[in-house]
Amino acid sequence: MRTKTIGLIAHTEKAGVAELTRAVVREFEQRSVEVLIENEIAELADEKAAGSPEEIFRRAELIVVLGGDGTILNVVAHAGENLKPIFGINVGF
């Protein structure tokens, strides 16, 4: 089964996260995957926003998290009953 929609959530204070966000978005879009970007990171990366983390949890099939361990754990804690598979990309120490 192919994933058609992913959510993208990131720690906005990590160095280089805006550039990494744009690169991740391009990679998924080239593969015809819709990317739902959380409002705050979308603004930082100059990308189209999809909504709050809660909205992204509801709509996405997979959540991609850009950040450290704390960011990933925070996403899991806030997903509630809408928890989806999470793919973490560690961008810090």
Named regions from a protein language model:
Residues 14-22:
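Glycine- and acidic-residue-enriched helix-capping/strand-helix junction motifs
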Residues 25, 29, 80:
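Anion (oxyanion) recognition and catalysis
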Residues 1-13:
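Generic N-terminal amphipathic, Lys/Arg-enriched alpha-helix
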Residues 16, 29-30:
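Short, basic/aromatic recognition patches that contact phosphate-bearing ligands
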Residues 16, 42-43, 48-93:
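Small-residue-rich beta-alpha loop regions that form the catalytic core of phosphotransfer
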Residues 21-25, 76:
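Short amphipathic alpha-helical segments and helix-helix/interface helices
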Residues 33-40:
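Short internal beta-strands
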